[in-house]
Amino acid sequence: MVKTQRVVITPGEPAGIGPDLVVQLAQREWPVELVVCADATLLTDRAAMLGLPLTLRPYSPNSPAQPQTAGTLTLLPVALRESVTAGQLAVENGHYVVETLARACDGCLNGEFAALITGPVHKGVINDAGIPFTGHTEFFEERSQAKKVVMMLATEELRVALATTHLPLRDIADAITPALLHEVIAILHHDLRTKFGIAEPRILVCGLNPHAGEGGHMGTEEIDTIIPVLDELRVQGMKLKGPLPADTLFQPKYLDNADAVLAMYHDQGLPVLKYQGFGRGVNITLGLPFIRTSVDHGTALELAGRGKADVGSFITALNLAIKMIVNTQ
């Protein structure tokens, strides 16, 4: 890395395990400066509950970034709206969570931070606070005015991107259009090259229907939409294989020769990845004008403040973000 960079972290729902994980993350050295967008008392109280040392130093945007030393974090303060009891949701803190996301996103857009790592949020509390909120991905897409973003989850062994995300099954076939596939594959291909350092990405593409349509006998979306798009993109030089039946694609003879899989919908691709690497996976938002990774788990309210939360996914998310920073320099 040419110079030390700053990575901003949002712990997510304050009553959940996000603050625990951030405190655990701070117990080791990092080659980047970790700037945590959070309430100071929340972090120090949670560190005390876990019996872990934590020193907060103020964020100074005009000073050079410094590698993170064990037991310390750089704090970009955002005040809680209500006091927090670990494991107990407070509706007003939905506003606090969104404020941390907005500040972190804006800092990435203005060049303060090289990447953003997000902890788990509780969507219900945010919506109960009167803030329409579908998820991190959609929030950052709108705030950054990105034309289109793509959700990808990854482990050390597997990357799975999604053509559609949080849609009911009944709506998916209509959503798989030539325009959508062109856009999603272009973003996936571009970010695999620029953010992952893969010169010529090899992408496996799932069919939509069982047996990838069985030649049109189990649905025609492959023939009418997916195959023509893949043929057009192959002419442009992209290395695309498919459409392949999803029930046979996820095996070594295909995956050993691929850099990523494109699934047509959420529950087509993610069960395999989460079975293989739950707790070690990372959620990546492709198509944003900055690097964003996230843990692949929820708020786990029942574990908050008890010292039982597994920091593995957060560590993986941060390590991946650091690699992506290096690839983009």
Swiss-Prot record:
Cofactor: Zn(2+); Mg(2+); Co(2+)
Catalytically driven reaction(s): 4-(phosphooxy)-L-threonine + NAD(+) = 3-amino-2-oxopropyl phosphate + CO2 + NADH
Keyword GTP-binding on entry: no
Subcellular location per the Swiss-Prot or TrEMBL entry: Cytoplasm
Cofactor note: Binds 1 divalent metal cation per subunit. Can use ions such as Zn(2+), Mg(2+) or Co(2+).
EC number: 1.1.1.262
One Pfam family, short name: PdxA
GO terms (BP aspect): pyridoxal phosphate biosynthetic process; pyridoxine biosynthetic process
Keyword Cytoplasm part of the UniProt annotation: yes
GO cellular component terms given for this protein: cytoplasm
Binding-site residues, substrate: H136, T137, K274, N283, R292
Domain of life: Bacteria
One GO MF term: zinc ion binding
Listed pathway(s): Cofactor biosynthesis; pyridoxine 5'-phosphate biosynthesis; pyridoxine 5'-phosphate from D-erythrose 4-phosphate: step 4/5
Entry binding sites for a divalent metal cation: H166, H211, H266
Keywords (A to Z) from UniProt: Cobalt, Cytoplasm, Magnesium, Metal-binding, NAD, NADP, Oxidoreductase, Pyridoxine biosynthesis, Zinc
Protein family according to the UniProt entry: Belongs to the PdxA family.
Quaternary organization: Homodimer.
Further details from the record: The active site is located at the dimer interface.
Function: Catalyzes the NAD(P)-dependent oxidation of 4-(phosphooxy)-L-threonine (HTP) into 2-amino-3-oxo-4-(phosphooxy)butyric acid which spontaneously decarboxylates to form 3-amino-2-oxopropyl phosphate (AHAP).
Name of the protein this chain belongs to: 4-hydroxythreonine-4-phosphate dehydrogenase
Organism of origin: Escherichia fergusonii (strain ATCC 35469 / DSM 13698 / CCUG 18766 / IAM 14443 / JCM 21226 / LMG 7866 / NBRC 102419 / NCTC 12128 / CDC 0568-73)
Gene expressing this chain: pdxA
